[in-house]
């Protein structure tokens, strides 16, 4: 499923090619690309749920204190490693992620049918969520810079 999400993001969203609106056509395209029907359905459902989260004002995403600290559940800690959790915290601290967007990211990560995701996978999920979050264009651009910027090895200038 994650491979399909990456395929869609890289071939349609990130390349600025117009995404096919018709789900049947998109399913056919993904099948021709070699993906299995069951995985396609899961990926499209994942994207629909992401869109629902953007529109719903889901209470669990909004019921928080700005000064609170996120405690991860056991299942979340098993799927999201320490490095990735630290990266999420870092993004909150530099204001790339709001608390609500962080919760959307965690929600979407937990719905991916992989036992664990590495930091690079988490970064792509963050990018997908930010891309689909109206009003977060600046955060999306910052996240893109963090993903695609190649460090030159120097810590100080």
Swiss-Prot record:
Pfam families: DUF494. InterPro entries: Smg. Belongs to the Smg family. This is Protein Smg homolog. It comes from Shewanella pealeana (strain ATCC 700345 / ANG-SQ1). The lineage of its organism: Bacteria, Pseudomonadati, Pseudomonadota, Gammaproteobacteria, Alteromonadales.
